[in-house]
Amino acid sequence: MAPTTYAGPSAGLPDQTALHTGRAVFTEAYAVIPRGVMRDIVTSALPHWTQTRVWIIARPMTGFSETFSQYIVEVAPGGGSDKPELNAEAEGVLFVVDGELALTLEGKPHQLRAGGYAFLPPGARWTLHNTSSSPARFHWVRKRYEAVEGIELPSAFVTNEQDVAIRWMPDTRDTWGTTRFVEPDDVRHDMHVNIVTLEPGAVIPFEETHVMEHGLYVLEGKAVYRLNRDWVEVEAGDFMWLRAFCPQACYAGPNRFRYLLYKDVNRHARLGL
């Protein structure tokens, strides 16, 4: 198997001679935020974080995607936070794509390297710092947890994708699979953040059209992706943001194609707006 790689934002600025022929688009059903538009001037700081900047690539928006936010966070050496999450109802997933981070979760220390994954239930006590000599980057997916009477909160856990086997879809000859960090039938969880892998030339062979919202961040490779009525070229470092019921399908390119996938799951549909 080829070495695992993880793409990140371009940062910097394009040259003044650059042409405006990029792929960024925002439609009624989906958005594509290419890597090339994730530049320094669109980053933000966060309260109680030091030497840190974030690209906020998704947030709840009425009439579009309403359930989650997603950040790409870059922490310089010596940076981090002792008070990272200000919303007591928020659950989160951290997924490290570059560098090394020191996570303390419920009093226990963990070292997160590329591929490192941490699930943080609402109310979890955690801190995060970059104690190394190089910048670190991670994805932070946040959702307001939907508690259900009689169902306990999910437990915090830390792992690395290298320690989790890919589960291949049936009848795909091991060419389309998912790295699942949570069992699908564990109804304590109301969101999944997985990694989808398509081997070269593999396809999603039908237009998935379903209630789940999606954030898809391309970790490596390239593909042609069906989004609503359009076929869109995407590559490592691009982000696709889908509202509920946006049709989607995929043809993978000449190399392995992988993306980090958010979806909301395991709860009744709300009956009010």
Language-model-derived ranges and their functions:
Residues 1-67, 137-191:
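A short, N-terminal "cap"/entry segment at the start of jelly-roll beta-barrel domains
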Residues 51-60, 69-88, 179-184, 194-210, ...:
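Conserved short histidine dyad/triad with adjacent acidic residue
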Residues 88-102, 106, 211-228:
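Glycine- and acidic-residue-biased ligand/ion/polar-headgroup-sensing regions
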Residues 107-122, 228-244:
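Short acidic-glycine-tyrosine-enriched beta hairpin
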Residues 109, 122-148, 235, 244-269:
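Ligand-binding loop in jelly-roll beta-barrel domains
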Residues 158-225, 232:
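Surface-exposed interaction/gating patches
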